[in-house]
Amino acid sequence: MKTITMLLTAFCIFFAAIGICLGADAQQGKLLFEIPTLGGGTSGKSCLTCHEHGRDFSLKTISKKQYLVMGNPVGTLAGVINFCIEVALRGEAIAENGQEMHDLLAYLSVFIQNNSDKSQ
């Protein structure tokens, strides 16, 4: 179990570093995570509303190959983010290869790592 945790931690750190190298900005991702207007959202909710302290995230979140969100199978973490933007925030999906998505993914790596012990 320790080995798996260490590998997942290393993967998260690596993923965050790759994001930074590719121009992703975790600080900008944090701002996006906290604003209710992401994707033109109209519900008044932000990502943080549902995921405060990493709720519903684990170290495995970043590396999963398949996700199940509200009973719906989703193939990528970017797809999960867009699902939440469309359903919870009542906005429009953002480009999966766009700067906002890269910034959010970079921030999520850090956010999940920092909150992995609090989300249980």
Question: Predicted regions span which residues?
Answer:
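Bacterial N-terminal signal peptides that target proteins for export
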Residues: M1-L8
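Bacterial N-terminal signal peptides
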Residues: L8-A17
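Electrostatic cytochrome c docking/interface patches
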Residues: G19-G41, L89-R90
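Extracytoplasmic/secreted proteins, especially bacterial periplasmic and envelope-associated proteins
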Residues: Q28-L32, T76, V80, Q99-A106
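The canonical Cys-X-X-Cys-His
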Residues: T42-G54, L104, L108
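Short cysteine/histidine-rich zinc-coordinating motifs and their immediately flanking basic loops
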Residues: S58-K65
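Short Fe-S-cluster ligation motifs
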Residues: V74-A95
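C-terminal capping alpha-helices of c-type cytochrome domains
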Residues: R90-Q120
